[in-house]
Amino acid sequence: MNSRWLIRISAALTGVVLAGVVLQGFIAVQADIHAGAYAPLVKAWKELVLVIAAVPLAVAITQQRAWGQFVRQPICWGIMALALLHGVIVAVYHHPPGSEFAGLVIDLRGYLAWLVAYTLVYLHPQALRSLLLAAGIGAGCTVGFAVLQVTVLPVDFLAQFGYSKATIAPYLTVDLNDSFVRINSFLRGPNPLGAYSVLLLCVAVAYGIRHWQQLRAMQRGLLGAVVLGSLVALVWSYSRSAWLGAVVAGVVLAASYVPRRFVAWLGAALVVTACVGGVVVYSLRQTPFISNVVFHNNAGAGSVHKSDDGHADSLRHAAQVVGQHPLGVGVGSTGSPSLGPGATPHIIENQYLYMAHETGWLGLGVQLAITAGALLLLWRARRDHWLARALLAAGAGLLTIGLVLPVWADDTVVITWWLLAGALAGWAAAAHSKPAPAAATSTV
């Protein structure tokens, strides 16, 4: 089979993952109800598809003698080193096999998505357009259902499909206040929906800035609907971390368009705005919205254990464990994998302590280096493709969310961002390679 067909097969499989991963919450619920012992494999469908997609790509690379491009890419070496480290840790530490399997999937799937997308788009730059289309389909489903949840559907609509406290709650509330219902859309919860909305907003806004003049009226309306729907999902997720991440992402996106001579003025304006905003929020702290949503202080009833206290307790415990175990505690030792049979539950609400808890300071350092490398490639490509600015800004926002939530532990968020980041990096590598394996002139 020639490389063209191999690449097409891989592109189709990768597109299915990118479009379908937004349904992961729904799929996970159905797997828990109907798949029994095979539920973990069903939940890992997208990782398995990415592994399958990597096989024809490896053959195509060999046929085109393009392995040198990957040897020269430091991120590829970093990902291989991280995978090797995980293998060593699994061999040394002994956790329940189910927990270790889930931990490996959660820890490595984002980097696998980056590798597959980088390879695919490097070999066939036009695949970037099809991947963006797949992402757009998934985004449309997510924000469309989110708007329906806010406007017309009953709050427990998802309960008829098996959503419950035993699987995924059909909805949540802010501090047990039924006046502030937090929606999920098809994702695993309100916080992942908020984080995903930050990514969608960055992509939609950056695309609009780049292509607004070329868009027809219907296309402008569709783009506006995506932006509005993403804002609805972000606001009604009531995710404070996502709101903060959206602010950081917006600042980074704006800064990427500002000429250097105005950067200082932008920084000063942001400082003033932040100070004024802080004063306004504090002065309105007794109003129902600010009291409930920002401070989670429900005077009427409220939960006994506040989420802020939970965050603080989680951070203190995680910092203590990481300090005592600089080599980590083992893959599958925290998060949802630690909730399985025979495991000891550890919930860590910080992405970086999450990494260090499982793989130690070395694993944390390797993953931060990989992330920094991915962001650096986006920075270098920001003037060549609008998507680079969008993903750079979204990455900054998601990393901010990671300070209070394990943002990369969510399937939809981690696969979408890393896959698109890898695709853009592959496009940029193809555009600047000499000779390039194919023309890479489209800016989509």
Tell me what each language-model feature is:
Residues 285-291, 295-359:
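Long extracytoplasmic/lumenal interhelical loops at the membrane interface
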Residues 3-14, 18, 72-83, 118-161:
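Interfacial loop-to-transmembrane-helix boundary motif in multi-pass membrane proteins
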